[in-house]
From Swiss-Prot:
This is Chaperone protein DnaK. Induction: By stress conditions e.g. heat shock. Belongs to the heat shock protein 70 family. The modification Phosphothreonine is found at residue 200. Keywords: ATP-binding, Chaperone, Nucleotide-binding, Phosphoprotein, Stress response. Acts as a chaperone. PROSITE patterns: HSP70_1, HSP70_2, HSP70_3. Residues 611-650 are annotated as: Disordered. Gene3D superfamilies: 1.20.1270.10, 3.30.420.40, Actin, Chain A, domain 4 (3.90.640.10), Substrate Binding Domain Of DNAk, Chain A, domain 1 (2.60.34.10). One of its GO terms (molecular function) is unfolded protein binding. It comes from Burkholderia pseudomallei (strain K96243). Residues 611-636 have a biased composition (Low complexity). Pfam families: HSP70 (PF00012).
C-alpha cells in the first residue's frame, strides 16, 4: 500500500507532508518552496497554472486568477459572507443552478471544489515527484468550525483531484498532533490552539494525555469564525490605500481590477514587512491614469496605523476563545501551552492579544505554516496502521438537529460532542392521518431552525393513517470520524425507513463529481501531451544550435552534396519549430531527419578529434624521449638520495 499523505488545503497557502518512519517530511514543490500559494489561473490557451506561477501573472490576468476560493467552498450564494466577497474579488462569483456560490473564469462556471482540486492535484504531484511512486490516499485538513456542507465539499475536491480522502481532520487538532508528538513534555497537558489563517479562524482546547504509553489527544471544545482571516487584514490595508489615493488624486481605484490586483499584492507585502519593522513604504508607479497623465502611488504605512486598521478584527478572535474555554469546562489558568497556527499569527498585535487573554506567552517553537500538514501526515500514518501509539478524539463543532412543530430547532447532537457518535430519538405526527413526514436537518446554535444552516431534507412516506401523536418515527443521527452526518428515519409500526447522507440541498451531485473527475483525468493527459511537446521542441532547438555550430567548424571537410543535405534538413526542422501548431510527431520526424543527414558530419568530427588526440599523444611521446636522452648519463637505479642539513645563520 502506498503512503497516505497529509495535505493542509489553506485559503492562502497549502502544504503537503508525509511520514518517513517516525520522522515527518514537509515536501518542497517544483519551485523549491515548502508551501504553495492556493492560487489558480486559467489561461487563454486552456492551460491551468497553480501556485507561484499563477500568482506571478495575477496582475495582468485578474479576472481569471482565482484565490481564497476556500472561503466559498460549501457555501450558498445568498449567504451574507459570500455577498460581501462579491464586491471585493476581481473575479466573478456567480449563483449556480443549485443556489451555491460558484466562480467564473473565461466564461466557464466552476464549482469551488473543482478549483480547489487543482491545488490538491499540485500537492499530490509534489508528493509523487518526491516519493517516485503514485499517491492515491490523503488526509485533508479543514477549519474546525467548517459545517457539514463545507466538509463534504472538501471531500469532493479530493475526489476530483484523484485522491481517496481517508479522513477529514480539523486544522487545530492536526496542529496539536504535530506539537504533542514533537515535544518531550510528560504527563497530561491542556493546550489551546489559536489558528488564524488566510480565510478562517479556529480555536480548540485540547487535552493531551499519556494513557498506558499511548498519546491520547482529546478535543474538549472548539469554536471559531469561518470568514475571518489574513485576507480580511489585507482588505483593510487595500481600503485604506484606496481612500488615501482618492483624497490625494481624486481617483477611485476600487473600480479598476488591474489596480486592485497590484494593491492586493502590495498590501500583503506591507502587512508582512510590518511584522518585523515599524514602517513600510508602498510604492506603485503608473497605478492608473486620467486626462492629466499617469498617476503614481506612494504611501508610508506605520505598524501603529496597521494595528488601528485591524484592531476590531483581532478583537473578534477573542470571543470564540472565551466560548471555547467555557465549553471545555476549564479556566484560562488551566491551559499549559498556547500554540499559534496560521501565517497571520506572526503579527505582533495578534501575539500580544493572545498573551493578554491566556495570560502566558504563546509557544514560538511550532512552525505556523507547516504544523497542520505535519499533523495530517501523522494521522495518515495512524490510519495506515503504521502507528499505534496515537489516539485522536475530535468533536463536532456545531449542534445538529431537526425542525419540529412551530419551527423550533430540536437538537439531536450537541456541539463539542466527541465523534464518531450516534443518537436516536422518537418523534410523531402533527396532524391526524398524516401519511408522510418531511425531516429537515439543521446545524447551528440558534433556538429557531430558520436561524441555522439547513443541511438537507428528506421524506418518510407511507405512514398508516392514525390520530396525531400516535405514529412512532425514530430519527437517527450518525456522525462519522470525518464529521460528516448520516441521517435515517424509520416508522416503527411498518419498519419502513429512509436514510440519507447529508449532501445538503446544494453541493455537487454524484454525476457532477464523476464528470469533474473525468475532466481532471483528461486534463492530466492533455498536460502530459503538452509537456512531451515542449520537450520535443527543446530537443529540436538544441539540435539546430549544435548542428549549425558543427557545420561552421567542420562544414569545409564535407562534400558539397552532404552539406546541402544537412542544411535542407535543418531548414525543414526550423520551419516546423516556428509553426505554433506543429505536433510532437512532426517535430520528432524532422529531428530524426537532421540526425540522419548529419551522420557524415559526426564521423568527420570524430575523426578530426581522434587525429588531434593522436597528434597530442605523439608530441607528448617525443618530448618524453628528449627528456630521457638529456638525463641518460645517470641510470635510474643509480639515483643517489642527497642528505641535507639546514644551516642556521646567526
Amino acid at each position: 500500500m502506498g503512503k497516505i499523505i497529509g495535505i493542509d488545503l489553506g485559503t492562502t497557502n497549502s502544504c503537503v507532508a508525509i511520514m518517513e518512519g517516525n520522522q515527518v517530511k514537509v515536501i518542497e514543490n517544483s519551485e523549491g518552496a515548502r508551501t504553495t500559494p492556493s492560487i489558480i489561473a486559467y489561461m487563454d490557451d486552456n492551460e491551468v497554472l497553480v501556485g507561484a506561477p499563477a500568482k506571478r501573472q495575477s496582475v495582468t490576468n485578474p479576472k481569471n486568477t482565482l484565490f481564497a476560493v476556500k472561503r466559498l467552498i460549501g457555501r450558498r450564494f445568498e449567504e451574507k459572507e459570500v455577498q460581501k466577497d462579491i464586491g471585493l474579488m476581481p473575479y466573478a462569483i456567480i449563483k449556480a443552478d443549485n443556489g451555491d456560490a460558484w466562480v467564473e473564469a473565461h466564461g466557464e462556471k466552476l464549482a469551488p471544489p473543482q478549483v480547489s482540486a487543482e491545488v490538491l492535484r499540485k500537492m499530490k504531484k509534489t508528493a509523487e515527484d518526491y516519493l517516485g511512486e503514485p499517491v492515491t490516499e490523503a488526509v485533508i485538513t479543514v477549519p474546525a468550525y467548517f459545517n457539514d456542507s463545507q466538509r463534504q465539499a472538501t471531500k469532493d475536491a479530493g475526489r476530483i483531484a484523484g485522491l481517496e480522502v481517508k479522513r477529514i481532520i480539523n486544522e487545530p487538532t492536526a496542529a496539536a498532533l504535530a506539537f504533542g508528538l514533537d515535544k518531550a513534555e510528560k504527563g497530561d497537558r491542556k493546550i489551546a490552539v489559536y489558528d488564524l489563517g488566510g480565510g478562517t479562524f479556529d480555536v480548540s482546547i485540547i487535552e493531551i494525555a499519556d494513557v498506558d504509553g499511548e498519546m491520547q489527544f482529546e478535543v474538549l471544545s472548539t469554536n471559531g469564525d469561518t470568514f475571518l482571516g489574513g485576507e480580511d487584514f489585507d482588505q483593510r490595508i487595500i481600503d485604506y490605500i484606496i481612500g488615501e489615493f482618492k483624497k490625494e488624486q481624486g481617483v477611485d481605484l476600487s473600480k479598476d481590477v488591474l489596480a486592485l490586483q497590484r494593491l492586493k499584492e502590495a498590501a500583503e507585502k506591507a502587512k508582512i514587512e510590518l511584522s518585523s519593522s515599524q514602517q513600510t513604504e508602498i510604492n506603485l508607479p503608473y497605478i492608473t491614469a486620467d486626462a492629466s497623465g499617469p498617476k503614481h502611488l506612494n504611501l508610508k504605512v506605520t505598524r501603529a496605523k496597521l494595528e488601528a486598521l485591524v484592531e476590531d478584527l483581532v478583537e473578534r478572535t477573542i470571543e470564540p476563545c472565551r466560548t471555547a474555554i467555557k465549553d471545555a469546562g476549564v479556566k484560562v489558568s488551566d491551559i499549559d501551552d498556547v500554540i499559534l497556527v496560521g501565517g497571520q499569527t506572526r503579527m505582533p498585535k495578534v501575539q500580544e492579544k493572545v498573551k493578554e487573554f491566556f495570560g502566558k506567552e504563546p509557544r514560538r517553537d511550532v512552525n505556523p505554516d507547516e504544523a497542520v500538514a505535519v499533523g495530517a501526515a501523522i494521522q495518515g500514518q495512524v490510519l495506515s496502521g503504521d502507528r499505534k501509539d496515537v489516539l485522536l478524539l475530535d468533536v463536532t463543532p456545531l449542534s445538529l438537529g431537526i425542525e419540529t412543530l412551530g419551527g423550533v430547532m430540536t437538537k439531536m447532537i450537541n456541539k463539542n460532542t466527541t465523534i464518531p457518535t450516534k443518537h436516536a430519538q422518537v418523534y410523531s405526527t402533527a396532524d391526524d392521518n398524516q401519511g408522510a413526514v418531511t425531516i429537515k436537518v439543521f446545524q447551528g446554535e440558534r433556538e429557531m431552525a430558520a436561524g441555522n444552516k439547513l443541511l438537507g431534507e428528506f421524506n418518510l412516506e407511507g405512514i398508516p393513517p392514525a390520530p396525531r401523536g400516535v405514529p412512532q418515527i425514530e430519527v437517527t443521527f450518525d456522525i462519522d470520524a470525518n464529521g460528516i452526518l448520516h441521517v435515517g428515519a424509520k416508522d416503527k409500526a411498518t419498519g419502513k425507513e429512509n436514510k440519507i447522507t447529508i449532501k445538503a440541498n446544494s453541493g455537487l451531485s454524484e454525476a457532477e463529481i464523476e464528470k469533474m473527475v473525468k475532466d481532471a483525468e483528461a486534463n492530466a493527459a492533455e498536460d502530459h501531451k503538452l509537456r512531451e511537446l515542449a520537450e520535443s521542441r527543446n530537443q529540436g532547438d538544441a539540435l539546430v544550435h549544435s548542428t549549425k555550430k558543427a557545420l561552421t567548424e567542420y562544414g569545409d571537410k564535407l562534400e558539397a552534396g552532404e552539406k546541402e543535405k544537412i542544411e535542407a534538413a535543418l531548414k525543414e526542422l526550423e520551419d516546423v519549430l516556428k509553426n505554433a501548431s506543429s505536433d510532437k510527431a512532426a517535430i520528432d520526424a524532422k529531428v530524426e531527419a537532421v540526425a540522419t543527414a548529419s551522420q557524415k558530419l559526426g564521423e568527420k568530427m570524430y575523426a578530426d578529434m581522434q587525429a588531434q588526440q593522436a597528434g597530442a599523444a605523439g608530441a607528448a611521446g617525443a618530448a618524453a624521449e628528449g627528456a630521457s636522452a638529456q638525463g641518460g648519463a645517470q641510470p635510474a637505479d643509480d639515483v643517489v638520495d642527497a642528505d641535507f642539513k639546514e644551516v642556521k645563520k646567526d
